[in-house]
Amino acid sequence: MKLETSIYDKLPATTKSGNVVIHKVYQRKGVEYARSIGGAFTLRVRDMDKHFGNPYSHVRALCEKDNLILTATTKDAVIMFIHYVLRSMDSRAVWIRSVLDSKVLVGKPLVYYSELGEPSHANALDYLINNWDEVKSKV
């Protein structure tokens, strides 16, 4: 987890930063909004296999409702998201890596639902998108 933690340490102090934009929208409406601004939606979307949502959360009720993996903190959830993207053989993680390889999202807006006052997995995704070749060489 050394690489994952070092990536987390490079993330901005707030959620709204870089290419991450805040817009309170959810599910397929979020996907539609992100497409309308030429970007990507970063949250989980029900009934979609391919999305950029984080399978980890520090919110117990959300984990129980959406079958997520519980972490102690938001920071832990973000680090675990980085780990998931870099190392998991889950089909969605493999798909995310293929999107990163394509570079189609470099410099594009990434829609997240709220300012957390700390980095979110959307910030981690932004970092991975825009530094993928360097990161990939270290995995």
Predicted stretch roles:
Residues 1-139:
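Catalytic phosphate/metal-binding cores of nucleic-acid and nucleotide-processing enzymes, i.e., regions
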